[in-house]
């Protein structure tokens, strides 16, 4: 998983590495590979394979189904999606169909902060002149990885919503104050008999 920051979102790029050591091709068109993706994802897109072929896939209710014929050797499936963040942080719950000890999380150095009891910081790696911080998953019986991302740049709309609620509360308080004051003034001006 490669996690990059956006404005009020994170971009998640997942790379599935498949190794077919048999002499036969692996055909998943009748029994697709399935990946359960996080809730709330937006703008999903599948990248082309290294051969330039389009990978057949379907996304229904956060379940990605991949129908492809994989040749002998190594293949990669790369796809990307956005996850919206709220006030600069986000919790990701990602379920995998394989052991978590094969999962790595990378993020460009100096931007996002990642925290999880299930991840161990494993150092830095450089790709294409970008240095990434890298975490490896601890061995676990669970196939659910949970981690929190913070330091995500926040959109001004998130703050304007909070400002709007505060202003509305202030207006309601002032209106109630004047209503109460007007009612008290009417009571004191009424003649007593």
Model segments located where?
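Lumenal/extracellular ectodomains and adaptor appendage modules
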Residues: 1-191
């Amino acid at each position: 998983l490669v996690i990059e920051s956006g404005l009020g979102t994170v971009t998640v790029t997942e790379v599935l590495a498949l190794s077919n050591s048999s002499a036969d091709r692996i055909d998943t068109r009748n029994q697709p590979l399935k990946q359960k993706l996080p809730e709330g994802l937006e703008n999903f897109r599948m990248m082309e394979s290294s051969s330039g072929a389009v990978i057949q896939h379907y996304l229904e209710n956060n379940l990605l189904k991949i129908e492809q014929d994989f040749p002998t050797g190594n293949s990669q499936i790369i796809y990307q999606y956005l996850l919206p963040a709220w006030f600069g942080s986000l919790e990701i719950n990602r379920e995998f169909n394989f052991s978590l000890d094969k999962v790595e999380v990378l993020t460009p150095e100096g931007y996002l902060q990642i925290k999880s009891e299930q991840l161990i910081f494993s150092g830095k790696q450089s790709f294409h002149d970008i240095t990434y911080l890298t975490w490896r998953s601890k061995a676990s019986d669970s196939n659910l990885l949970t981690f929190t991302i913070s330091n995500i740049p926040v959109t001004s709309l998130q703050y304007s919503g909070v400002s709007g609620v505060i202003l509305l509360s202030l207006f309601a308080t002032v209106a109630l104050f004047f209503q109460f004051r007007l009612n008290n003034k009417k009571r004191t001006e009424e003649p007593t008999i």
